[in-house]
Structures are given as structure tokens and as C-alpha cells.
Amino acid sequence: MIRNVAIVSLSNGIIGEPSVQFEVEIGLSRLKEYGLNVRFMPHALKGLDYVRAHPEKRAEDLLQAFRDPKIDMILCAIGGDDTYRLLPYLFDHNELADAVTDKVFLGFSDTTINHLMLHKVGLRTFYGQAFFSDICELGPQMHPYTRKYFEELISTGGIREITPSDVWYEERESFTPDQIGKQLPAKPDHGFELLQGPSVFSGRILGGCIDSLYDFFDGERYEDMPVLCRKYRLFPDAADWKGRILLLESSEERPTPEKYRQALEYLKGTGVFDAVSGVLAGKPMNETYAEEYRQLLVKVIDRPNLPIVFNLNIGHAMPRCIMPFGVEATMDAEKQVIRFGT
């Protein structure tokens, strides 16, 4: 059971801004209601400008959280777009490998990069939720589906199975204090969609936000990101992907079909689609470009026998489950369930 939680800002420093402290207090109150002891790491609340300017302090917070034997869980504040800048401070002298211990690590979006860092040093992690994005939800409570998985994780230290949500929500348009207590209208969801291939397949899941993975190979956002990712060999090689299940979900930027296609083409060039046992794709935010994404997954991957399942409640669309990485998983699209081993 989780007792002590450390909150880290590994990408964006928004939770330190005065304008969002009412949201931070909502999230902190909810965590305390679970009986959790919450610790913001020393630089987590320093704000946008400081956090962006000091990747070495972000890395320091992560290392300190892993080294502290009292901390059971490391909870990422939110995503962002430049957590790759932590690489030198975590790998130049084996800092991360020397510090890492078996703790629950939870985050998504740009945190995809951190998941791959931790995969590189052998830690199993959990993908799908973050403090500011989920625990600080402005509605009267966390979304019930989101809450169910968070409660399972903090009470058992793992996730046993994932089933689809009955509903989904469009992204909140305003995050001002007058939105406190306002529940978003729910829309009916329709479960996991098998686009092609066998309905049952197994493997250890790895992956994350397709936008972040695209940035591994394309320097449009940051010129040095592909350089650093290659230097530290962050993207797993084809042999490491063998038999795994690839998770892909799209960001709040809602990539155009052309950009989604480019990202898939880059991934295809790594050989990942020839190695994995299946592909899981998350529901896009607000279902934007959902039909185009379905078609592109089938067309670009171009392996008719490779299972592809779309519309998982994971990533940037609400609500969100929590998905274990590095644990043997079996997807049964017909029975609408993903089951996890130990």
C-alpha cells in the first residue's frame, strides 16, 4: 500500500504558478483524504520559468525521490515538452541507475521520455495519469473511471486489469475558479475497437505519447532532442521491442493526420512494427481525427496480421486508466479486457 507520495515537475513547472494554486489545493486535499503523506520535491513548485531554466534541478528532484527510502510513489505533476533535457544529468555518470529503487512511478504525455529513461535502467512504471491533470480535476470529484484506477494503484501497488469506460468527456474549456465543482457532461463511449488482426494477444506494454516519440526523430520542436536521444540510446532497439505491445496515444496538440502519419512512418523505420506483438492506440482528445487515425494505423503499419486495437481510455482524452509498463499483459478485444500478470 502506498503511504508517502513525492510530486515532481520533470517537464512543465505550471504547478508553481500563483494562478493555479486553487487547483493544486484541490489535488492536495484529495490525496490527503486517501491518508497519503504528500511531499513536493524541492523544485517542483518553483514555477514555469525556473523549472524550464533548470533541467539539472528537475533531475536532482527525481534522483532524491528515488533515494529516499520513505517515498513509495513518485507522481509527476504534469507533462510538458522538454524533459529530454534531463538526460545528461541522469546518465552521464550512471546517476539514475545508481539511484533507482523499486517505487511506483506514474505520469504520462511528455513523461513518456521519463518512462523510457526508467525502462533503460530496468524499472517497471505506470502510464496514464498525473497530479495536475487528474487529481486536481475541477469537478466535484475525480472522474469515476480515473479515480477507480488511481485508488487501485495506491491500495495495491499495481493494476490487475483494464476495461473500457462507459463514457468520455470533452476537454474542459475553462480552468478558472468559477469552474470548481462543475461536472463535465458525459458522452457514451463504445469500448475497445479491434481494427485488424487476432483479438487476443500478449506482451509487455511500452510506449506512450506519439508526439513525444515523434520528437525523438524530428528536431522541429527542439533541434538537440534527436541528438541527445541518439547519444543516450533512449529509444529501445528492435530486439528490445521483440514481443512487446506498443502503446500510442496522441497529445492535446491534436496532431493533424499528416503529422500522425509522419510519426508512424518514423516509428516504422525503426523496425518496431516488425517486432511487436500488437499495437494499442488511445482515444484522441475530443475524438479529433479519430477516423483518420484509425485509417492511418492500418495503412502505414501495413501488417495485416498485426493486432491493432483503438479507442483505449489512455492518454489525453478523459477519463484515463493507468497502464502498467513492463508487466506481462493479455489483451482480449472480444471480451473487452486487458489482464496483467505479476
Question: Predicted segment positions?
Answer:
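Long, hydrophobic/aromatic-enriched structural stretches that serve as scaffold segments
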Residues: 67-91
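ATP/nucleoside-binding phosphotransfer catalytic cores, i.e., glycine-rich phosphate-binding loops
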Residues: 259, 265-268, 278-342
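Oxyanion-binding "anion nests"
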Residues: 205-251, 255-257
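Structural motif
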Residues: 73-75, 106, 245-249, 280
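Conserved anion/nucleotide-ligand pocket segment
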Residues: 126-211
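Charged helix-capping and loop-helix junction motifs
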Residues: 21-24, 55-59, 92, 260-266, ...
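Short, acidic/small-residue loops that bind anionic groups at enzyme active sites
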Residues: 92-120, 124-132, 307-308
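ATP/NTP phosphate-donor binding region
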Residues: 1-70
